[in-house]
Regions:
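Non-transmembrane, aqueous-exposed alpha-helical and coiled segments at domain scale
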Residues: 1-424
Length: 424
């Protein structure tokens, strides 16, 4: 048995939460492998919207186990809030959620470092979510971090206090003004730890090995998007983890030969939150229309998302880096009513035409090259069968499949789990 992966192919916000929720019935275990509460995975069913930040998106399904892998960073305060909301919905977390001992903890001072760092950059800020993600991964690679398993060890509180002291010295070096009460922040953090201690901690790499041996079906859930990958994204406007398929191996402790299907999710157009290059960004009425109809606001930050045409150059880059085997297209319904739909097929870059992602998308000479297709006017939100979709919508799908050389197996036409079309 192999582990299947589900990954975003753009700058995040592709709709991974919904699709994980839709596919969970086919699996025994759902596992998050990287990122932290900077993620906002939105699920909608029975007319109610749910947003998850750290907990895997299979949590609402009975008899499904959800695992937070070692590659994830956890903020106990935000985690506590997630737990409380799920308890209100009568979700039995003790039976459905376990955590890797090797996952790192986000301390309150990690958030303060994030804030101080961003303030110190002025106009050159990268658009951090200010959740302390980057500083936590810095402590991880710097071998200073506090891990979930430390909570089971004697003297973890001393390690916590020492790390807080180091962080406070670092914050002072930024020479920016930040208001905070460290004692209140520590008190809130320590009280939130009690909620984590109610759950089971595991040696996740061993757990996954045994689960694979027993033939249990596992779906690994990525966070953010491939274009935010620390190595292969639009650096430095990226997140601090590997959001690509390789991150599932290191973030769960599974070998590459145990990876099965890789499901790549993309929107029918492109969005981005925060700073960073965006070659196909729209500043006109069409971009505003996409944002309004697509409800393009970050589930974590609430910030409006920038919108633009679909970019096949960056999409192919993500497909290649991840080894995608099947495609899933989200929000095709948002494009209804647009007369002409543009698709970026290449870039003019430093006097040449390129069909790959160059070293920097910020180069002033970079200009997208577009092809154009006829749009459709029909409302497709209630369509449940592919054959009943408008001809021009199907032409759009066929065009993308030809260009990307992959089948689009699932099409989402709305936020609810029922608004999903499966293709044979």
């Amino acid at each position: 048995m192999k582990i299947d992966l589900i990954l975003g192919l753009q700058w995040g916000d592709e709709g991974k939460g919904k699709i994980v929720d839709v596919l969970t019935s086919n699996y025994d275990i759902i596992a998050r492998f990287q990122g932290g509460p900077n993620a906002g995975h939105t699920l909608e069913f029975d007319g109610i919207k749910h947003v998850l930040h750290t907990i895997p998106s299979g949590i609402f399904h009975d008899k499904k186990l959800n695992i937070i892998g070692n590659g994830v960073v956890i903020d106990p305060v935000i985690f506590k809030n997630e737990i409380e909301k799920l308890k209100e919905l009568n979700v039995d977390l003790k039976e459905k959620l376990i955590i890797s001992r090797k996952a790192h903890l986000i301390l309150p001072t990690h958030r303060l470092i994030d804030q101080a760092s961003e303030l110190s950059k002025g106009k050159k800020k990268i658009g951090s979510t200010l959740k302390g993600i980057g500083p936590t991964y810095m402590d991880k690679t710097g071998r200073n971090g506090l891990r979930v398993g430390d909570l089971e060890m004697e003297g973890w509180n001393e390690k916590f206090e020492n790390l807080i002291s180091k962080h406070l010295n670092l914050i002072n070096n930024f020479n920016v003004e930040i208001d905070f009460d460290i004692e209140e922040l520590k008190k809130e953090f320590l009280s939130s730890i009690d909620y984590m201690n109610e759950l089971m901690f595991i040696d996740s790499e061993n757990y996954f090995h045994n689960s694979i041996e027993k033939g249990r079906k596992i779906l690994a859930e990525g966070a953010q998007g491939s274009l935010l990958d620390i190595d292969f994204g639009t650096y430095p406007y990226v997140t601090s983890s590997n959001t690509t398929s390789a991150g599932a191996c290191t973030g769960l402790g599974v070998p590459p030969n145990k990876i099965g299907d890789v499901f790549g999710i993309f929107k029918a157009y492109t969005t981005r939150v925060g700073s960073g290059p965006f070659p196909t960004e729209l500043f006109d009425e069409i971009g505003q229309r996409m944002a309004k109809i697509g409800n393009e606001f970050g589930a974590t930050t609430g910030r409006p998302r920038r919108c633009g045409w679909l970019d096949l150059v960056s999409l192919k880059h993500s497909i290649n880096v991840n080894g995608v085997t099947e495609l899933i297209m989200m929000k095709g319904d948002v494009l209804s009513g647009i007369e002409k739909i543009k698709i970026c097929t290449g870039y003019k870059y430093q006097g040449s035409v390129v069909n790959h992602l160059p070293f920097s998308l910020s180069d002033s000479s970079l200009e997208p090259i577009y092809e154009e297709l006829d749009g459709w006017n029909e409302d497709i939100c209630k369509t449940t069968d592919y054959d009943n979709l408008p001809l021009n919508f199907k032409n759009y799908i066929n065009y993308l499949e030809e260009k990307l050389k992959l089948k689009i197996k699932i099409i989402s036409v709305g936020p609810d789990r029922k608004q999903t079309i499966f293709r044979k």
